[in-house]
């Protein structure tokens, strides 16, 4: 992409644009792709190093050494431990007593893939801003497929927050999509691989007592998405 174009959902008018090609160099350029494809690229030379289907059951800190004990009784010792397993970090819970759980941010994320559209500049990133609803559309391959990510304000009671199967329920999904601004219904009618999930955020920062243990990403602190921040982070 050469630009990020900002639009108003209510008026469909363009607000402004940011020419990101100004930040490109010959060997380092802005690009957009699916997160899953990025993960495949990053791990392609690490297949023999990454342990699949391993779950940590205990973290033992002894002086400057850290021992990991897995549920299959395997052990591993390291000098430094980087924890990056998301907002509901199991690893963080193993080293932190009385952990404050993340809170629901009264926000839902909607994600999927849509086909090429005459109404969208398919070469660039399009960011649409509206009251209680933002969404971003950007190209992910040379075939014209577009990634769609939206952030919507939506209240869930405590039972609904815990009910993971709710987000696969056809009636619930329809209820969510019916609240989407009418200006973008056309995109949702063509969306594939639709996923809807609640957004949880952190209440406080946590610093480990051991300087050899480092928390990063949402495991360290999950920020609330605002002004499509969550969608923008997905682009990055």
Question: Could you describe each region identified by the protein language model?
Answer:
Residues 82-83, 110, 137, 172, ...:
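Conserved mid-domain beta->alpha element of the FAD-binding
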Residues 77, 145, 211-212:
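Conserved catalytic motifs of the protein kinase core domain
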Residues 7-9, 53-55, 71, 130, ...:
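Conserved beta-strand termini and adjacent loop/short-helix elements that scaffold enzyme active sites
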Residues 42, 73, 99-102, 126-127, ...:
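Short secondary-structure boundary/capping segments
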Residues 1-96, 100-113, 157-160, 167-170:
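Conserved N-terminal helical subregion
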Residues 16-30, 34-39, 74, 116-196:
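Conserved FAD/dinucleotide-binding core of flavoprotein oxidoreductases
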Residues 34, 52, 152, 216-219:
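A secondary-structure boundary/capping signal
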Residues 53, 62, 131, 140-142, ...:
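Structural motif
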